[in-house]
């Protein structure tokens, strides 16, 4: 009897221990019962494609068939922890147009990266002590169509870099932010020597003498400058408002002036866009971009009255304008 009781007690103890162990293991391994730790990172990924197509078949009034496409991408990664904020944004655009009996032509080309680190005194403030880095260039060669023999721009020709420190007011709820830096270094890169020799995009042009053997050729005494550095004041602003249901008005403005060279002459880059959202995947947009840089000389064609040859001469700085109207598909993903 004692042996039976002892055996029964041992079995009950083992059974109880087994049940407890299973409960512990089940509690430990069940992912649904684990606490969710919020991430300090937020991200945004949006890609879009605008397509415009016109076709004419036996159209008596005349016309040229064409098709255009514009790819757009916007990506962002933002890290916020306590009083620290680090935001990174990447914007990319590339557009092509094909008309009947003409070559494929580029209509838009841009890649821009913006990185901003900010520190605020308390987590309730919208004011940050900030450091900002901007970089923008293009993907492929640009031409003055129909002339495609010599590119007028290339990858890293030009490229613009901004690096500075200042203050930023960032309001996520109202989707707006303003940045002011009294100390910003601006670097213009023209890493194509032919374009640098011409003084393209504000770099110092090269000096040459005509080739005595072939007067049409040039002997470069001093090559053009590939890098231009400026030091000045930078202001950037961004606002996005819903002006009507599913109608959004977005503005981006950048102003820069150099302390050392023509202080007060302001470089302007203003981009405004009106988005009309049909649904989560279809959107129409109207955009205008205006650029003015006092160091960039526009060109105009002139004809020599004696020889009849055509050439281009500097025509002073001019405002640059681009207007876009498109309807296309958008897709956002995590």
Please report, for each region that a protein language model flagged, where it lies by residue.
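Residue-level signature of outer-membrane beta-barrel architecture
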Residues: 75-79, 119-121, 169-171, 237, ...
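Sequence/structural signature of outer-membrane beta-barrel proteins
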Residues: 52-58, 93-101, 120, 136-145, ...
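Transmembrane beta-barrel strands of outer-membrane/channel proteins
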Residues: 47-53, 90-96, 131-137, 165, ...
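Outer-membrane beta-barrel "beta-signal"
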Residues: 274, 319-334
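Transmembrane beta-strand segments of Gram-negative outer membrane beta-barrel proteins
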Residues: 37-53, 84-86
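Residues that define the transmembrane beta-barrel architecture of outer-membrane proteins
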Residues: 65-71, 107-111, 157-163, 227-233, ...
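Repeated loop/turn-to-beta-strand initiation elements of outer-membrane beta-barrel proteins
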Residues: 84-86, 123-128, 174-177, 246-249, ...
